[in-house]
Amino acid sequence: MDQNQHLNKTAEAQPSENKKTRYCNGLKMFLAALSLSFIAKTLGAIIMKSSIIHIERRFEISSSLVGFIDGSFEIGNLLVIVFVSYFGSKLHRPKLIGIGCFIMGIGGVLTALPHFFMGYYRYSKETNINSSENSTSTLSTCLINQILSLNRASPEIVGKGCLKESGSYMWIYVFMGNMLRGIGETPIVPLGLSYIDDFAKEGHSSLYLGILNAIAMIGPIIGFTLGSLFSKMYVDIGYVDLSTIRITPTDSRWVGAWWLNFLVSGLFSIISSIPFFFLPQTPNKPQKERKASLSLHVLETNDEKDQTANLTNQGKNITKNVTGFFQSFKSILTNPLYVMFVLLTLLQVSSYIGAFTYVFKYVEQQYGQPSSKANILLGVITIPIFASGMFLGGYIIKKFKLNTVGIAKFSCFTAVMSLSFYLLYFFILCENKSVAGLTMTYDGNNPVTSHRDVPLSYCNSDCNCDESQWEPVCGNNGITYISPCLAGCKSSSGNKKPIVFYNCSCLEVTGLQNRNYSAHLGECPRDDACTRKFYFFVAIQVLNLFFSALGGTSHVMLIVKIVQPELKSLALGFHSMVIRALGGILAPIYFGALIDTTCIKWSTNNCGTRGSCRTYNSTSFSRVYLGLSSMLRVSSLVLYIILIYAMKKKYQEKDINASENGSVMDEANLESLNKNKHFVPSAGADSETHC
């Protein structure tokens, strides 16, 4: 009798072990595929941010408009995110994520298409479309008592030039492609995280989330590396003779091969979509597999019938689902803790998004570093630190079994530390640029009070210069001049790089003693002290990003814990929608609009309209860029304090009682009942179906 009982137990244990193995393997396969999609998602995001400067210059648009283009990703996401979050959890989640990745890839390819339909990039008004004529002969020098119209085209030519002008409406294709990329990215986070939270073992979802976010940082590393590489390549590489291009990557008019970034990221997104189409809807064992035990076979048959009935009911009860959606939506909006947390994260994330969107422009204007160098430093150095912070944040929550209030305190602490390091940026600013007629007078002694009209000096008043031109030259006195003509230069040497100008009369008025009144093409570089400050900036950026990442996992965990278990997916989706709508869309726009106010020299295209900004007042730029971001962060900290106080009143007693009973609140917020009122064990109660 004992032997028969032992055989029966063994027979029952074997299918149980097989089920557990298949279940865990299914979840691990999903995690692997989701990791690939996270890499594709973050790669696309970094590619867009690192290409902002080049898109702005290539299409001759303002920072506020390029911020709007950047926000089109969030617009696309916003269009479908709530419905994907709610109804997507009832459908085949892996396949929906796969479709999203494919659409995201198509959007990336579409973003790059305008490059193939536009003419050659014209970095100067004097630069002809024929690349072979980009030589010093097209540079205007001081032509005393000669007519300026010699350099101007006829109205007919100007009209034709407007049709292919860089600042035309071709940027709309970039807008549409980025929006399509946002639509495709929508299912990845809410459906992926809810899938993990539903099927992971108790307490493991935070660890998995930390691992996912850490792996996702591979995308930014690749993105920054590609951004650095392609930023050094001229935009029309393969189409023009590069030896005739007289500007360098340090020039404010330089445009890199931004379109190659989007081709690479788009193709990678398409590839990442493939594994999801081969994954099951849930990590269950195949229904056709038979159980050894008769009782287990009966249970399995009942489960299959229940699943079939549920699928049938879902198809017939669309109206009921819509009603349930609005009831669920009302439930999360009447949750004061959830609403407060959404508001504070909106302020916090708006600061991050706005600052990161224009960080490359900030580095270029403040420290004189090209975007290619900023890309590689931010990618190679800071991103591994950021990934470590994400992983460590999830590990700390799991290791110390932080309750809801504990997670909120931990998140607030990381925000305080991040702000503390961010404020240090105010102490490592460089002096304002020295640009004659824009930031200082031509004698180099006094700052210019207004830059609405370029003030001329007696040293160039007879040169008949085009004041709208931007062809900067650096005098050997360390001052940048808007053009060789406005520097009073009479002659030049060299048809390619480097080009040197001589007999520059405006250098003489600065009191230069060596009587070598020459200038070379390009803006004057920053001094060594400013370069050292740039490396301090990178070091502080590492610490700032580490603490920002350390609290990243806690954001998701707080959302999961302060709403009902069945509303997790909707709460995550609505939170993401608000962040994207008011943070992702608006933050780049108002950051860009304020940055535009610090511009001191705008380009003018052939249509006579304003193009992109050529140079900024770096001091005003820093005040706007750092000040706005700091104010948003401080405001979020005030809400953090209020949130923690409210959480203590609501959760502290409950957490103490749970601790006394020897239990820990899991991500499903304790055990629940299924639709038929049968008891359904939590993640920790059934080790066979959770990993």
UniProtKB/Swiss-Prot annotation:
Catalytic activity line of the entry: taurocholate(out) = taurocholate(in); dehydroepiandrosterone 3-sulfate(out) = dehydroepiandrosterone 3-sulfate(in); estrone 3-sulfate(out) = estrone 3-sulfate(in); 3,3',5'-triiodo-L-thyronine(out) = 3,3',5'-triiodo-L-thyronine(in)
Positions bearing carbohydrate: N130, N134, N432, N503, N516, N617
Membrane spanning stretches: 29-48, 68-88, 95-119, 169-197, 217-237, 256-280, 332-353, 374-397, 402-425, 538-560, 570-595, 630-647
Cell compartments where the protein resides: Basolateral cell membrane; Basal cell membrane
Membrane side Extracellular: residue ranges: 49-67, 120-168, 238-255, 354-373, 426-537, 596-629
Outcome of swapping L193R: Strongly decreases expression at the plasma membrane; abolishes transport activity
GO cellular component: basal plasma membrane; basolateral plasma membrane; membrane; plasma membrane
Result for mutant: E156G: Decreased transport activity
Expression (tissue specificity): Highly expressed in liver, at the basolateral membranes of centrilobular hepatocytes. Expressed in liver (at protein level). Expressed in fetal liver. Not detected in heart, brain, placenta, lung, skeletal muscle, kidney, pancreas, spleen, thymus, prostate, testis, ovary, small intestine, colon and leukocyte. In testis, primarily localized to the basal membrane of Sertoli cells and weakly expressed in Leydig cells and within the tubules.
Residues annotated with Phosphoserine modification: S293, S295, S672, S682
pH dependence: Optimum pH is 6.5 with prostaglandin E2 and L-thyroxine (T4) as substrates.
Biological process, per Gene Ontology: bile acid and bile salt transport; heme catabolic process; monoatomic ion transport; organic anion transport; sodium-independent organic anion transport; xenobiotic metabolic process
Listed InterPro entries: Kazal_dom, Kazal_dom_sf, MFS_dom, MFS_trans_sf, OATP
Pfam families named among the record's database cross-references: Kazal_2, OATP
Keywords, ordered alphabetically: Cell membrane, Disulfide bond, Glycoprotein, Ion transport, Lipid transport, Membrane, Phosphoprotein, Transmembrane, Transmembrane helix, Transport
Molecular function in Gene Ontology: bile acid transmembrane transporter activity; organic anion transmembrane transporter activity; prostaglandin transmembrane transporter activity; sodium-independent organic anion transmembrane transporter activity; thyroid hormone transmembrane transporter activity
Disulfide bonds: C459-C489, C465-C485, C474-C506
Cytoplasmic side: 1-28, 89-94, 198-216, 281-331, 398-401, 561-569, 648-691
Domain description: A conserved histidine residue in the third TMD (His-115) may play an essential role in the pH sensitivity of SLCO1B1/OATP1B1-mediated substrate transport.
Family: Belongs to the organo anion transporter (TC 2.A.60) family.
Disease named in the record: Hyperbilirubinemia, Rotor type: An autosomal recessive form of primary conjugated hyperbilirubinemia. Affected individuals develop mild jaundice not associated with hemolysis shortly after birth or in childhood. They have delayed plasma clearance of the unconjugated anionic dye bromsulphthalein and prominent urinary excretion of coproporphyrin I. Hepatic pigmentation is normal.
Role played: Mediates the Na(+)-independent uptake of organic anions. Shows broad substrate specificity, can transport both organic anions such as bile acid taurocholate (cholyltaurine) and conjugated steroids (dehydroepiandrosterone 3-sulfate, 17-beta-glucuronosyl estradiol, and estrone 3-sulfate), as well as eicosanoids (prostaglandin E2, thromboxane B2, leukotriene C4, and leukotriene E4), and thyroid hormones (T4/L-thyroxine, and T3/3,3',5'-triiodo-L-thyronine). Can take up bilirubin glucuronides from plasma into the liver, contributing to the detoxification-enhancing liver-blood shuttling loop.
UniProt cross-references to PANTHER family, sorted A to Z: ORGANIC ANION TRANSPORTER, SOLUTE CARRIER ORGANIC ANION TRANSPORTER FAMILY MEMBER 1B1
Protein name: Solute carrier organic anion transporter family member 1B1
Species of the source: Homo sapiens
